[in-house]
């Protein structure tokens, strides 16, 4: 097992040659070794088949249709901040707010029901999944744990919850079909022996979507806000852009990604710069050499797990001037020249394993950040720990991160 952070080798591994994912690592992400989820396929052909089955539901047109559902969840987050301003002096735990909102959005868009984490503070399903996430983090770096007899599998609550909601959907598929991702998965179910998409597979996919679709997006939102409150001059420029696209005080007009996502380039630059400095996938999704290779002059035997450490490349001074600094402006010229794909920048990985939910995440981030910035002023609260850890996704080690929030005055 080795780690590589050379810009050219990382690009070769994850993009140019598109090495398959590591069996040693991703074998740990399977409830049933013979039934991997999309994230855990290591066979390229089998992965391509499952991706074809699912990828159509992550098309831009369908994702745009989910905006009203996402907005409902964000409205609850706005109300939560309003309550904190009125009752808690405007001190808001933005880490848990972003995470709770992301969980509620996944619940609404996949399961057809919000988990109301922002409103109630918790829900059994995401609580169980958070424990699974910690266990997965251990397995990522200590795969030998897999060999321990009677190692715990997926919690029974998760199996019961997902199976129950799936069976209810199957029963009402014709009489009252819903327009969400779970419904589309259920429509592809096949109980026949030898089927490539069984109820077990649906359980696995929706569970992974909930985990992968919350931690990565929520932390990208949090780190973007954190970078902005650390740099008030950048924050003021973002406010000016938000106000130019959505006139101050006109909160009746909803945020619309079709209208503003591509045009609000400075906000996007702030997001990209935050994802460069603190990428969710810091280790770049572990790959495997399927033949003897040479990496940076060293022989790498077939079967070696290789961590293409994208964060190392994102911080490389030979690639990025002032690499350790938060400089959103660097992206504006990149956008203008249409050279984003040419950058050594892989927050969503690359090649055939680029994140299938990339556009879902970018839409959610845009809706969340623009909605909050239209209404509130955010202020940095010093003295808090800001160390990050990596457990499947990179996030704050501390259980909370607060900011001072005030209503904007127009």
Swiss-Prot record:
Question: What is the disulfide pattern of this chain?
Answer: none
Q: What are the protein's UniProt keywords?
A: Heme, Iron, Metal-binding, Monooxygenase, Oxidoreductase
Q: What is its EC number?
A: 1.-.-.-
* Named cofactor requirement(s): heme
Any GO molecular function:
heme binding
Tell me the pathway: Secondary metabolite biosynthesis
A Pfam family of the record is p450
Give the function comment from the record.
Cytochrome P450 monooxygenase; part of the gene cluster that mediates the biosynthesis of macrophasetins, 3-decalinoyltetramic acids (DTAs) which feature a tetramate (pyrrolidine-2,4-dione) unit connected to a decalin fragment and that have potent bioactivities. The PKS-NRPS mpsA together with its associated enoylreductase partner mpsG incorporate one unit of acetyl-CoA, seven units of malonyl-CoA, and one unit of L-alanine to assemble the linear tetramic acid intermediate corresponding to the backbone of macrophasetins.
Query: Which family does the similarity line name?
Result: Belongs to the cytochrome P450 family.
Q: What is this protein called?
A: Cytochrome P450 monooxygenase mpsF
Question: What organism is the protein native to?
Answer: Macrophomina phaseolina (strain MS6)
